[in-house]
Amino acid sequence: MALMIFSMVFMFILLFKPLVFSMMNKKCLNSTYTSTVKWAFITSMIPLMMYMNSSKEIIILNWHWLTVHTIELKMSFKLDLYSITFMPVALYVTWSIMEYSTWYMKHDPHLKRFLNYLSLFLITMLILVTANNMFQLFIGWEGVGIMSFLLIGWWYGRTDANTAALQAIIYNRVGDIGLVIAMAWFYKNSNSWELQQIFSLGTTSNLPLIGLILAAMGKSAQFGLHPWLPSAMEGPTPVSALLHSSTMVVAGVFLLIRFHPLMSNNSMIMTTILCIGAMTTLFTAICALTQNDIKKIIAFSTSSQLGLMMVTLGINQPYLSFLHICTHAFFKAMLFMCAGSIIHNLNDEQDIRKMGGISKTMPLTASAMTIGNLALMGTPFMSGFYSKDLIIESMNTSNINSWALITTLIATSLTAAYSTRLIYFVLSNSPRCNSVINMNESDNKLTSPIKRLMLGSIFAGFLLSNFIQPVNMQNMTMPFTIKITAMLVTIMGVIVAMELNLMTQYMKMYPNNYNFNFSIMLGFFPTIIHRSVSKSFLNFNQKIATSLMDYMWLEKIVPNAVVMMNNAASATTSTHKGMLKIYFMSFILSMVMLMLIMS
């Protein structure tokens, strides 16, 4: 236990070292960041090996922060299966991304600040994962959010980057409302934010659980709060790789995994998670099919896999969801790094229709992208297979909503379709780019990280699946057709994608084809939420300001009131028409009649 605590403390000291050096204005080489994360990864393997040997969880109570009324806030770390396993995965992936960043961002004048931001991004995620109380978890949660804002908007001179960063932070604020509601409820009812005391409540109200679901929807870009995820591609590619693999987007799913003991017996909450995940995985898979931006295709694949993780939670399998988080991190980071390498060599071209033939000019990148897409599809014996196949089997053998099962199977097939489309357009056929472009992948800072993640994409699933077992015992026997369901839908997706890709070579496409507008326009969510709703509010407020207030004040009350008063006075004074003879005769007649009456 002492060795585990020492290795944890040493790991955090290593991660903070380059940050402290940069604050002290000491010279810190770019390679220092990479080597620091590498040694932190090696150190994090010690608790993992100790846990694999003993299977004992520990809680480290280090420092008493403060006391508010009857609640004590302590800095405490929970080292269980989730945190001990996730730390080496996150550090291994970040080690590769850090080294890749020194190549990708080498011409950026603020590279050291960029590496500091990446380090802080990693540290806040590790704080979130290892937190044993909700206050500490909230610090990591908000830290991940603010670092994503800074990194997505790194190129702050571009309007699109600033808008994307604002989208990310605003959508996450919506999710944060749910987390704050859950924290307030737990504080009121359990008088503690320690996870053990919260779990000891047993049954809880639906309110905090719905708050946790809302928080996960915002952070993990679930259906309804998803538009920020494709927009986040405006940031540098290393940011996309880290954001989508092992930090921010999986934080929401990890939150639900951490609080799964409170939800496991609540059928309404589990069904809600299941339906949200099923809608997300299908909708984003459909959107990925018709995108032409290579980074956005990979981004939508991330969102689809996050939906699959939510579906897994909805069928009461948190361990399988966590296994998919870990295996997904390797090949998703590698796919983004391959995309960045291709974009960099094609002079910032991101349209897959203007690529092609990359396998001949950049063989390592092409091989890595092929392996990454195969792992994403769940090809047997790739890392994605060990989690994805188990998830589909668990869904087939559980009492699941049939709609959610069919939706997830269709999304799995579409995953194979857009992955095949990506390989077909980017890697195969002849080049469709400018022939003057000089392509190369000779830099070790590019090739070494991709090779490391390639190994992880092949072997990580086998290694992790050996000690992350399903929480519920699976059927030892099942029909052969159910056993191969995942493979069948994947093969079907590949065949359909190949047929469609070949068909487009001979089919005349009309420019004004509106059949794909729903998918291309991302279900019209950005148009409706960002344009139509805001425009209607602006028009409504403008009408109140101009048509109601200005019209009443400037036309009815002040100028028109004066005019009306003048008209009334004028009408009153103009009743005398100046007919003196008639007036005099009327006066004489009235006087004569009065005298006659009086006499």
UniProtKB/Swiss-Prot annotation:
Membrane topology: Multi-pass membrane protein
One GO cellular component term noted in the UniProt record for this chain: mitochondrial inner membrane
GO-annotated molecular function: NADH dehydrogenase (ubiquinone) activity
Major site of localization recorded for this protein: mitochondrion
Chemical reaction(s) catalysed: a ubiquinone + NADH + 5 H(+)(in) = a ubiquinol + NAD(+) + 4 H(+)(out)
Listed EC numbers: 7.1.1.2
GO biological process: ATP synthesis coupled electron transport; electron transport coupled proton transport
Membrane-traversing stretches: 1-21, 41-61, 79-99, 114-134, 137-157, 166-186, 198-218, 237-257, 269-289, 297-317, 323-343, 362-382, 400-420, 453-473, 478-498, 509-529, 578-598
Subcellular location: Mitochondrion inner membrane
Entry similarity comment: Belongs to the complex I subunit 5 family.
Function: Core subunit of the mitochondrial membrane respiratory chain NADH dehydrogenase (Complex I) that is believed to belong to the minimal assembly required for catalysis. Complex I functions in the transfer of electrons from NADH to the respiratory chain. The immediate electron acceptor for the enzyme is believed to be ubiquinone.
Name of the protein in its database record: NADH-ubiquinone oxidoreductase chain 5
Organism: Geomys personatus
Annotated gene: ND5
